[in-house]
From Swiss-Prot:
Catalytic activity line of the entry: thiosulfate + hydrogen cyanide = thiocyanate + sulfite + 2 H(+); thiosulfate + [thioredoxin]-dithiol = [thioredoxin]-disulfide + hydrogen sulfide + sulfite + 2 H(+)
Primary residence: cytoplasm
Function: Transferase that catalyzes the transfer of sulfur from thiosulfate to thiophilic acceptors such as cyanide or dithiols. May function in a CysM-independent thiosulfate assimilation pathway by catalyzing the conversion of thiosulfate to sulfite, which can then be used for L-cysteine biosynthesis.
PANTHER family in the record: FAD-DEPENDENT OXIDOREDUCTASE, THIOSULFATE SULFURTRANSFERASE GLPE
Keyword annotations: Cytoplasm, Transferase
The organism's taxonomic lineage, starting at the top: Bacteria, Pseudomonadati, Pseudomonadota, Gammaproteobacteria, Pseudomonadales
GO cellular component, one term: cytoplasm
The name this protein goes by in its record: Thiosulfate sulfurtransferase GlpE
SUPFAM superfamilies in UniProt: Rhodanese/Cell cycle control phosphatase
Length: 109
């Protein structure tokens, strides 16, 4: 894949069940208030370590608030060598309304 793909929450749920990595690029307070279960919080301070330690071929799902900022972040990850990147349409807001039981709370790390 030379570009990221936009996917629905339903497609993201299926990929997550198969072991896809989920990264949440929202601010730390929003992440702490609620995020996709198993998601890693990713920001300007943690992205370098994330990239260095990541499997660049693993499916990687990027989520933001509404599915807009995640597209830029997904494109950035593709530019860093990731080959299987997806932006979740509707962001965490749509995910939470679709799958309220698939969310967690708490700070990163």
């Amino acid at each position: 894949m030379s570009e990221f793909k936009r996917i629905s929450p339903e497609q993201a749920l299926a990929l997550r069940a198969e072991g896809a990595v989920v990264v949440d690029i929202r601010d730390p307070q929003a992440y702490a208030a609620g995020h996709i279960t198993g998601a890693t919080h990713l920001d300007n301070h943690s992205v370098a370590d994330f990239i260095r330690n990541a499997d660049l071929d693993a499916p990687t799902l990027v989520v933001c608030y509404h599915g807009n900022s995640s597209q830029s972040a997904a494109a950035y990850l593709v530019g860093q060598g990731f080959s299987n990147v997806y932006s979740i349409d509707g962001g965490f807001e749509l995910w939470r309304s679709t799958y309220p039981g698939e969310t967690a709370q708490g700070n990163a790390e």
